Amino acid sequence: MSFSFNFDVQLTTKCQQDEENQPQDGNEYSEVEPVPGITITTQDETVKAAVEHFPPATPHSLLNDAVSETITIGTLPPLNFLNESVFELTAYERDDEEMILSQTTAQCSDLISGVYEGGLKVWECTYDLLELLERDGERFAEKIVLDLGCGAGLLGILALKRGASQVHFQDYNSTVIEHVTLPNTLLNCLEEEEEEEEEEESKGKKPGKRQNNDEVIIEEEEEESMKSTEKTKSELKNKQKNEEVEDGRPHAKRQALDSSQHPKLSGCRFFSGDWTSFLSLILKEDPSLKYDIIFTSETIYNKAYYSALHNTLHRLLAPGGVIYLATKTHYFGVGGGLHLFEQFVEEKGVFDMEKLWVVEHGLQRHVVAMHFKTKDRF
């Protein structure tokens, strides 16, 4: 099995630490409505409120001065993502309301519990899960996928490239979603659009022209039309800017305008927030939303998060769906790990767990599949 990286730039940073942490879910702190049937124990009376994030009116702005790298695993499509070293070195230039970029740099830390849950880094187990998906050939066509604790979003991006009808990304930190997940998703969407354009041109279509009702429309006319359309979109967006609902989600028309910037993005949604508040937000969807596939990588490092994670998986997995959990055997210094989570899941009696792969080199790691027990499937 081939496993290769294509780095546009390589740097060595002063904060290269070990591997026993990772994401959970976020944005601003506020109280969250209780979800019927769910009991959550937290260390604080408040949790990080769930917020849905949308691509900006000019998505390309997310990629200004971006330095990317590409990972290729076997027959999987290449996955593009921001170079972590460059991102760290340029962190001071970025807007960061959560202040996690400055804190992680100052503390030379990959994890600050309850503040920053590790989403700026791609962790080892994500690569393990990608390798397993390449080996086993999971099919994503027409499926609804959730990348829970997504970080860079590589798992969700793979599903998007493999034909998933919808892919939703969730991370604890809004900074991660806005500065990492969204740009990474756009990097891959742009690549696919360029490939499609090249394919069309190779079939004989001339650049700068298109056919419409047997008339040839010159590039200059197209540009004028695009400018007019963008102006209209901008005016509509400004008009709708204040049409926010109480749960933090924008007006439906605004969603459509934002997602229309790129066809591939129309099937993507992006969320930050604690798992409890994220679950509360998703359960308000009408019609109700369930996921055929849920990815969650390196999210069981802290025992305090198990209840919120389990409840989220329980309420959002579709009947007959599958959860892919990638994890280390034990997270030294944090306390969590696979054995403790298996015990927790067994006590709840909701899911069966199946070990799909054990990785022995380095710290022992696992990829596990979770399904509803037969009585809970429907």
Label the model's feature ranges.
Residues 1-378:
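S-adenosylmethionine-dependent methyltransferases
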